[in-house]
């Protein structure tokens, strides 16, 4: 698998049914046996002999089983001990409480309950702030602080809010995967040319003969013979402008330009109009026909129903929107895809937008959605920020994040699930998004566990 090239279009085959033997092993959490069964089924002498489509699906399942086997290793005892270091007295019943609130990513495997390797950091990193604070302060009630939202005030007063950022990013193999003299191929996210961003400048690149793409997933690319300790590094600047849009249900029109109808269609394997999601959309819509009101109902549903939680790598999901709807948890991208899919089912053009959240001190991965309603055109919907605002009692921000947004974003992806440019030879680190970058040797696949990466703010200032 490490040395086997991957056809990017095969990612769409995640929606193809698996043989019963594999489904049984996967759902039993017996991933090593599932990998062995995949190899048995791929043997040309095995009955039944599969067509090339199913063979490609089985090879794709390798990545799925391998990822789950390697990423879910933390035991229940290890998770309790990790949290108890920061919160003495934390025990099994407390972990059960957190599991039941949807904030712990776990699987039942052949070895028992296993948590994702980053689940502890997710719990301790603020997603369970209320529970852990009240655990440490028995009898007291946690009250989140709500400060003045300066972004909303500025946009309402001036009509826009703009920020210029200078960002530095780099990516490299970690020490265990340095291959002296081998050709390394590297892609780093770069700001898209879109309505929100302007004054885009590539200030420096560590290696010559680089390529700046204009694909839906925009990157700076270079390939070079690798030397120990070397990094592929870029520095760039851009201005992001958020323009105030005052929405009115009465002013909304349902016109959809013909060129935007592609944004009302399915896109395998995740933006799929499953029977459940179609029924859910119909239930939420009721008899309503106004596109803006319908989109608002979908936004309200996602922000109320889906709690923010760290997620495994997106390539380890069969259907992301279904996961969000059925499990009631997900991260920013999971929520965005559920909103996008519901809108498309209703005939409302909707799309993905992503990259990173930026503020004057840090850069962090972030995804959100856009939807189209006349006469305003493309509008933003940030379901994860909106859901957090709702749970904190910040109704002003919750309402604002339906239709409007802030300038504290670096947009690198204007589309979900688009090929890298130039194409990768091996499986993408993230086949659907690009927030940290991609890297591979000419003859070897590298995973997230095999790389080191950095992204940070060099300078930031408001543009008047």
Locations of regions flagged by a protein language model:
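TPR-adjacent "capping" and linker segments in tetratricopeptide-repeat scaffold/adaptor proteins
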Residues: 2-17
């Amino acid at each position: 698998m490490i040395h086997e090239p991957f056809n990017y279009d095969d990612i769409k085959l995640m929606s193809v049914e698996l043989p019963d033997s594999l489904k049984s092993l996967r759902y039993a959490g017996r991933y090593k046996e599932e990998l062995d069964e995949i190899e048995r089924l791929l043997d040309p002498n095995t009955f039944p002999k599969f067509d090339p489509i199913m063979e490609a699906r089985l090879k794709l399942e390798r990545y799925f089983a391998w990822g789950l086997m390697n990423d879910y290793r933390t035991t229940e005892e290890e998770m309790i001990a990790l949290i108890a270091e920061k919160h003495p007295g934390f025990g099994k019943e407390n972990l059960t409480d957190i599991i039941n609130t949807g904030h712990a990513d776990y699987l039942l495997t052949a070895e028992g309950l296993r948590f994702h390797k980053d689940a502890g950091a997710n719990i301790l990193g603020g997603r369970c702030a209320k529970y852990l604070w009240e655990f440490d302060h028995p009898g007291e009630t946690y009250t989140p602080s709500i400060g003045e939202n300066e972004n909303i005030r500025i946009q309402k007063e001036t009509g826009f809010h703009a920020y210029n950022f200078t960002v530095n990013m780099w990516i490299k193999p970690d020490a265990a995967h340095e291959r002296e003299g081998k050709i390394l191929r590297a892609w780093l996210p770069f700001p898209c040319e879109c309505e929100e961003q302007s004054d885009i400048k590539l200030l420096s690149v560590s290696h010559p003969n680089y390529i700046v793409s204009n694909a839906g997933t925009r990157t700076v690319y270079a390939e070079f013979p690798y030397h120990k300790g070397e990094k592929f590094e870029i520095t760039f600047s851009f201005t992001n402008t958020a323009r105030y849009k005052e929405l009115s249900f009465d002013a909304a029109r349902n016109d959809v330009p013909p060129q935007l109808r592609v944004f009302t269609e399915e896109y395998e394997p995740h933006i799929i109009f499953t029977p459940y999601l179609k029924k859910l959309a119909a239930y939420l819509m009721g008899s309503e026909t106004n596109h803006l009101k319908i989109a608002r109902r979908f936004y309200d549903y996602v922000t109320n129903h889906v709690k923010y939680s760290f997620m495994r790598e997106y390539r380890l999901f069969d259907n992301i929107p279904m996961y969000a709807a059925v499990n009631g948890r997900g991260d920013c991208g999971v929520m965005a895809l559920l909103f996008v899919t519901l809108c498309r089912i209703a005939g409302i053009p909707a799309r993905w937008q992503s990259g990173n959240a930026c503020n004057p001190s840090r850069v962090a991965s972030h995804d959100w959605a856009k939807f189209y309603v006349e006469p305003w055109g493309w509008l933003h919907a940030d379901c994860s920020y909106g859901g957090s605002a709702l749970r904190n009692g910040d109704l002003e921000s919750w309402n604002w994040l339906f239709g409007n947004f802030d300038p504290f974003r670096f947009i690198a992806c204007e589309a979900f699930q688009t090929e890298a440019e130039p194409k990768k030879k091996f499986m993408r680190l993230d086949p659907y998004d690009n927030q940290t970058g991609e890297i591979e040797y000419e003859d070897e696949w590298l995973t997230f566990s095999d790389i080191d990466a950095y992204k940070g703010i060099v300078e930031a200032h408001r543009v008047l």
